[in-house]
Amino acid sequence: DAPLVATQPEFSVNCLTPLRDGTFDQCLSTGMVPLAWSPLSGGKLATGDGIRPELIELLDELSVRESVDRATIAIAFILANPAEPIPIVGTQQTSRLRELAKATGVNLTREDVYNLIEASDGVSLP
């Protein structure tokens, strides 16, 4: 039998399910690679449509601090996860891909990540 080497959960700062349902725990324990689909929530994280205002505000604050756009911060959030998810972006525009690639140079602190999770959930972490 061939081992499973990848999984493709929906994961974004707006969809945190893999943090809570054991998906990323399994990836860490088995070496399986998570391929995060819809990392920008179908473009909603870029536009702000239908996203908690607190989350958009924090993404915007971090984007100013890091000199990138909101979507790039959202990708940086994914890259900050210890399970090392690979975001699957839906654009084919070279300029957009270049902008999102800047996420590899964004330095989100643990506090930034926790604050993003809290803003996404609308509740404080313990």
Q: What do these predicted regions represent?
A:
Residues 1-125:
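Beta/alpha (TIM)-barrel catalytic core signal, keyed to glycine-rich beta->alpha loops juxtaposed to Asp/Glu
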